[in-house]
A protein has these predicted regions:
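Acidic/hydrophobic-patterned starts of short beta strands in beta-sheet-rich repeat architectures
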Residues: 35-55, 89-98
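Alpha-helical adaptor scaffolds
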Residues: 180-241, 245
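Canonical tetratricopeptide repeat
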Residues: 215, 249, 283-284, 288-291
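C-terminal motif of bacterial Sec signal peptides marking the signal peptidase cleavage site
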Residues: 16-17
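TPR/TPR-like (Sel1-like) alpha-helical repeat modules
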Residues: 255-278
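Acidic, small-residue rich beta-repeat scaffolds with periodic aromatic anchors
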Residues: 5, 24, 97-205
Length: 293
């Protein structure tokens, strides 16, 4: 009897001692879980990736932890719809689809993020109807989206001529001064291009005014639209290989986007052309020599 009582007492003590570490383990895990949640929140708070979303009629942009609301830019009515297109971490687009008349219209606005706001890089307009297809791109300089209205966006390029094509499908490209400087031809029928837009493969750009094209590429770089500037400068060099300043401008853009190896090649080409064409070498920027070392 006594032996049985001692055995029971010993077994109960053993169970009690085993339970206490389990209770202690549970109490320790709570602060660890809380710390993990806090770390995740801090990580989100320090996330510098730009973010753009739609809330009702407004465009919400978060850039470097700063939230900006662009009011009433989202229009979804009987005849107009708005689509937000996330292009990359540096840019996005708004596409307005209008079908109120027999001539269907799409307008695409390409924006970039900047420390001083959201800037409109270019506006593309494509129309399709009984007259055929017309398509234009207008570049903008220093067009900050802050306090702009949908009506102001719509009015951009209103003075440009409408050149409809029945058989072809090409894009007329204008600089920020409304000067046409290039065309872009597509291998689509007019109807297929309109239906597929903006998901169309790049066409061939033909530059007709190299001075305006180069100036526009330089202006794109100034507002931080480096990829757009790069594409245009590459076309200039391909079609006008003796255009000296284009090599310098392209090298500067490549340097900005951290492609230093290609930048050095174009700095060297720029310097070589300056020498071979007997240009004034005193006009060569010091950064050219510094960066090709």
């Amino acid at each position: 009897m006594i032996k049985h009582f001692l055995l029971t007492l010993t077994f109960g003590f053993f169970l009690n001692s085993c339970a206490k570490p389990a209770e202690h383990q549970k109490k320790v895990s709570d602060p660890l879980d809380h710390k993990s949640i806090s770390k995740t929140q801090n990580s989100d708070k320090n996330d510098q990736t730009p973010n753009v979303t739609i809330e009702g009629d407004d465009l919400i942009v978060v850039y470097k932890n700063k939230k900006t609301v662009y009011k009433n830019l989202i229009v979804n009515e009987m005849s107009v719809s708005t689509e937000l297109i996330q292009n990359s971490d540096s840019d996005f687009s708004l596409l307005y689809d209008q079908n109120a008349s027999s001539t269907k219209i799409k307008e695409k606005y390409d924006f970039i993020y900047s420390d001083t706001g959201i800037f409109l890089v270019d506006k593309e307009i494509i129309k399709f109807g009984q007259d055929g297809l017309m398509m234009t791109r207008l570049y903008l300089d220093n067009f900050n989206l802050l306090n702009k209205t949908y009506e102001e966006l719509q009015s951009l390029g209103a003075e440009l001529p409408d050149h409809f094509e029945q058989d072809g499908s090409s894009l007329s490209i204008y600089d920020s001064k409304n000067i046409p400087f290039a065309t872009k031809n597509f291998r689509y029928s007019a109807e297929d291009l309109f239906i597929s837009y903006p998901d169309v493969k790049d066409g061939d750009i033909k530059i007709s005014n190299v001075e305006s094209a180069n100036n526009q590429a330089f202006n794109l770089e100034k507002i931080g639209a480096n990829q757009q500037s790069k594409i245009l400068l590459e076309q200039i060099i391909r079609q006008f290989p003796e255009r000296i300043v284009a090599y310098l401008n392209l090298a500067d853009v490549l340097w900005k986007i951290q492609d230093h190896d290609q930048a050095k090649i174009h700095y060297a080409k720029y310097l070589s052309l300056m020498k071979s064409q007997n240009k004034n070498l005193s006009k060569v920027p010091q950064r050219v020599y510094d960066r090709i070392k």
